[in-house]
Amino acid sequence: MTSIDKQKERLEKLARWKQKKSESKAVLNTQNVNTNSQSSNQNNVSDIENKLEKVKAWKKRKLEVKSDQQTPPATQSEINHTSSVRLEENIQGIKRKKRQKRVSNVFDEVKPINSTPTNDAQLSESDILEKVDLNTEDPLDSFFGNIETTEEFHFEVIDNKVNNDELLDEDNSKFDALQKEQKKLAKAKKNKNKKLLTPVNFRNIDLDPISKCLYNEPEEIKSYTEDEIADLRLDLDNIKIEGKDCPRPVTKWSQLGIPYDIIRFIKDVFSYKSLTPIQTQTIPAIMSGRDVIGISKTGSGKTISYLLPMIRHVKAQKKLRNGETGPIAVIFAPTRELAVQINEEVQKLISDLDISSICCTGGSDLKKQIDKLKTGVEIAIATPGRFIDLLSLNGGNLVSTLRISFVVMDEADRLFDFGFEPQIASVLRTVRPDRQCVLFSATFPSKVSNFASRFLDSPLQITVNAEGMVNERINQKFTICSDESDKFKELLSLLKVFNSETVDEKTIIFVSSQQICDIIEKRLTDYSEKLYSIHAGRPYNERRQNLELFKKTSNSILLCTEVMSRGLNVPEVSRVILYNSAKTFAQYVHSTGRTARGTREGTSISLLLPNELSSAYILNKAMRDKDFSECPVKEVKNLKQMAQKFEDGLKSGKYKLSTGLGGKGLENMDNSKETSNNDLDEQLKHQDNISISQEADLPDDFKFDTSVETVTNADGTIATVCKFVVNDLPQLVRWEMTKNTSISNMIRETGCSITLRGRYYPPSNVTNDNNTEPKLYLLIEATDDKAVRHCVDLLKDNARVGFMKATSESLRNTKY
C-alpha cells in the first residue's frame, strides 16, 4: 500500500471518529453538565501550569547559553559530546510531545462504553483515560509511526536552529551528507542501467585476416593532373580533405568497378543518376580500406556512400561458419526510426545477394532478434543500447564481436548528443583492432573529433561545403537579362558608371570564347579608349603588350577569355564582369578571384540569361546571405527558381553539372549556353556585318544511323544487338568514338560487347552491292536492352565531343 492510500485510509477513519466523537459528546453534555464544568476548570488550571513550566524552562536555557559564553572555549570532543546530548534531549522531548498528542487524540475520539446513564457517569477525563488500553495498536498510531523519522528530523532541525547554533551546524552537516549519499545512490542507479562490456585482449586470439583495400583507380582518373583534381573537388561543392594519401574523386558510377546491373539498380531505385559530391570522394576512400569521417548536410546521399563499400567489404570476407552468429558489419544509428530506414535500404541492395541483415532496436521483439542472430547474419543495423543488450545475453556467449571488421556510425553528432558515446566506445573495445571505421555526420563538434582521434586509425576527413569557396572580401552580384541584346546594354551601362570614377579601379571582362572576345572588342572600341583584349589566339608579343598597357593605364578595361583567368595577377582590379556566366564552380572561383587581391576588396558581376540554369545553380551555391541582401528581391527570387529547376533536373538525370573534365559539350546544361552564343553571333553579324563561325553542337539536320534488334543465340539466350554506323561521320568524330580509351570506358560502364566491323568507304565511293563488306560500324551486344541503349547514348556523347573538336580545328585553320 502506498503512502497516498494510507493517507486516504487515515482521512476516512478520522471522519468516522469525528462523527462518533460528536455523538458521545452530546450524550455526556446532557448527563454530566456539572462534571464537564469542573473538568473544564481543571483543564484551564493545567494549561496555566504548563505555560509557567515552559517559561521557567526557557529562562533556564537562556542562563545556560550565557554561562557557556562566559566559560573558556571547550575542546572539539566536548562540543561534539554536548551537542549529541542536547540533540538526544530534543529528540526525546519531541517524542514525548508527540506521544501525548496521540494519546489526547485517542481520548477525544474514544466511544463511550454505554450510551445510557450509569453509576459511573460522573467519571473525569483522567478516569476515562485510565480505562483506555494504551497497549492496543491503533491504525492512526501505526501511520504516525511510519512517518515518525521524517517528522522528527524536520522538528529536530527547526528546534536546533532556534535554540542552539552549534546543533544547527552539526545538523546541517548531517543533512548535506545525506544529500550527497542520495545523489550518489541515484547516480549509481542510473549507471546501472548503462550496460558496458568488458574489453577484449586480442593479443592471444588468432584472428582471420580481413580484406579492406578493394578499389583500383581507373586509368581515366590517373590521367588527371593535380590542378585538375583540385578544380574537380572545387566543382563538387568545394570538397575539403584532411589527411594523407586520399584517393582521387570519381565522376561516374562505372569508375568504381561496380557491375552494370548494380549501377542501373542504383539509378532506377535510388534515383541517383549521377554521384553526389559526398559520394564521389567518400566511396573511393572507403573502398580503399581507409577510416573515413564524412561531413555533409542531411539528404546529400551519405547512406549510399557507406552502404556500397560495406556490402563489397562483406562479400570480400570469409563466409560465416556453422555456429557463428556474426555480424561482419555493424551500423549504429541514434534512433530506431533511422535504423529501420537504413535496414530498408540495405534490404534493397542485398535482395539478390547471399547476405542477410538484421535490425536491432529497442521496443521490438527481442526473441525474434535472438532467433535470427542464431542463424547467422552478416550485417546488423542497431541502436547502441539494444546491441549491448544482445552482446550481454547468456553471459556474452550469444553474439560474438570477433567477426566484426566494418563499423559505421551514422549521424554521429546525434549519437553523441543522445549520450551513446560510452556504449559505442564499449563495443569498439571488443572489436578487432584492425577493423575499418566509418563515421558520417552533418556537423563535427569537438566531442565527435575527440572520439575519432581515440578510435579511428589515421582517418580521412572529407567535408562537403559549398560555402566559403569565394573570397569573403568579394561582393558578389548578378543580373538576369532577357536576351543577348539586353545583356550587351547592361554591360555598356556598367562600363559607363566605371569610366566616370576618378580613382584607379580596373575592370576585367570574361567571355567564353575567342570569337566572342573579338566581337565584343570591336563593339566596345567606340565606348572606351582604354580597352585591351587578350586570348590564346593572339600572338604572344601582342598579349604581353596589351597586358602591360592594362596595368599601366588607370581605369582600364581588359577583355579576355575564361582560360586566361588563372594567370592574371593585377592588384588594382576592383571589378570582374562575367559576360558569359561560369560553367563550373572552379571557373567561377578562378574568375572572381582576379579581384580582391591581398587585403583589397572587390566586386564580381555575373550576367545571366533565363535559360542558363546551371550558372544560376552555381551562383546560388556560391553567394552568401549578405550578397543576396544587396540584390533586388525579385532578381533573387528568379535566381533561386532557376537554381531549383536545375537541381531537380540533376536528381532526375535531365541535367548534369559540368566538372570541367572530359571535354566540352557533353553536359545538357551546355546546350543552352551554346545556343545563346549562336544567338549573339547572329545578332552581332547582322549589326556589324561580320562573318564568324561559332562552335556548334551537332548539325541541325544530322541523324545517327543506328538499328536495334533482338536475336536468339545458339544456346537459347535472347540478346539485344545494335549497329551504329560511323562510316559517314567526320574523321575526328570517328576517332573520338572508336579510340581505345572511349571503347574501354563504355564497356566498363555498360557491360556491353563493342566491336568495330565493316570497312571504311569514302563518301564518293559507296556501293550498294549486297555482296560487298558493309560500311564501317560499331556492333553493340548485350542481354539487357537498357544496357545497349545506354551504350548508344554514350556513343552519341562522344560524337558530340568529336564535332566540337572538328569545329575548333576548322576555326583555327581558317581564322588567320
Curated annotation (Swiss-Prot):
Residue ranges, annotated region (Disordered): 1-48
Query: What domain of life does the UniProt record list for this protein's source?
Result: Eukaryota
Keywords in alphabetical order: ATP-binding, Helicase, Hydrolase, mRNA processing, mRNA splicing, Nucleotide-binding, Nucleus
- List, alphabetically, the Pfam families matched: DEAD, Helicase_C, KH_12
What is this protein's function per UniProt?
Answer: ATP-dependent RNA helicase involved spliceosome assembly and in nuclear splicing. Catalyzes an ATP-dependent conformational change of U2 snRNP. Bridges U1 and U2 snRNPs and enables stable U2 snRNP association with intron RNA.
Q: Which GO terms describe its cellular component?
A: nucleus
Supply the source organism for this entry.
Candida glabrata (strain ATCC 2001 / BCRC 20586 / JCM 3761 / NBRC 0622 / NRRL Y-65 / CBS 138)
The answer to whether the entry has keyword Manganese is no
The record's gene field reads PRP5
Amino-acid biosynthesis found in the keyword field: no
Lineage from the top down?
A: Eukaryota, Fungi, Dikarya, Ascomycota, Saccharomycotina
In this chain, composition skew of type Low complexity spans: 29-46
Q: What protein name applies here?
A: Pre-mRNA-processing ATP-dependent RNA helicase PRP5
Q: Which GO terms describe its molecular function?
A: ATP binding; ATP hydrolysis activity; nucleic acid binding; RNA helicase activity
